[in-house]
Amino acid sequence: MDACVEPSSRHSRLDRFASFISLQINKGPNPLFTGIIEELGRVHSVEQRGENARIVIEAHIVIEGTNHGDSISVNGVCLTALDIQRDSFAADVSKETLLRSTLGSLKAGTTVNLERSVTPATRLGGHIVQGHVDARGQLLGVEDHGESWTVRIGFPKEIARYLVFKGSVAVEGISLTIAGLTDEYFEVAIIPKTWEVTNLSTLKVGDAVNLEVDVIAKYVERLLEMSDKL
């Protein structure tokens, strides 16, 4: 192949990839999050409604500026805020979400990570998080280093291809960077601030956690699958 043609072709594919990503991220009303937890909420009640459930969560910060129907991430799951009160909000959780995520194990008193969806003025401090759980992982271990913690999370094989060393992953809705990776687990380094303002410190070895891989990895995979059509 002509060496002068190859770079041009490569740049063309990169340009199409950038346009594709931009289109996907901005194409609809789907809410987005950054993985920067704003507040630790507390589950007030869980009411079973057939195969679904309604949860009421005590909160303060995420209620500010939130209207009926707005989206709030609860442990990394995008939920619609309903019945907003001065110090709480409710949300309905579908059967599928109860089965796919850890929300099915919530009970009164459980601490949860909360984040409002982004606005045009929001700073993207973490990475793009959709609030769509890809899999449930398991907390395998926590190493306390005094001023930091190393958390080890086991994950199912179906999401392994989306995880890369130094890449992003959302754990319980928290934007984290993969500091260590094997075929069966990854490790993340936790700073004191994150330990303080999230539910990680309340989890025990063996607990299930919600995992969401970086959506950009999914778009790359899809682009490669559809490359002949773009």
What are these regions (language model features)?
Residues 18:
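Short polybasic linear motifs
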Residues 25-230:
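Conserved loop->alpha-helix
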